[in-house]
């Protein structure tokens, strides 16, 4: 049986461990004084492009500018006149002072700024909406194959916008199409408010 152990004896630190028998599955230590930005979405401005690093630095309001590597650039930023097998660099996709929406993937650590992405993901109760990544559709691999097939049909019936990806979370198992549709509509409204 899995157990969750919570240690909150120190006012500035919270420790949570998940165990099964004598095996530690997960350990999370949260410092209350630290500002957590992971998962947050910000409107930022490209402050510097570093082709040698294949990355850009983005001012999104934190103490240090965030680090945006080329692999985290959403397809919408790639040049439209792409030729077969043509390779791009970060300077082909972004310009200095360009405003972009970014999501924090990793919080600041030491002297390094936060790791950022433009491939946004919005998590709902049953679904995850990928508003600028149409190829990121799927169903949680934790579900059995029979349930996955049922959910696949339900997701297709949702008629999500073609440019957006939808992933069904494990919590979506056994949910009726109305609940999934409600979750999708909520996430679409959140995305609309962000943009």
Residue locations for each model-derived region?
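Single-stranded RNA-binding surfaces
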Residues: 1-195
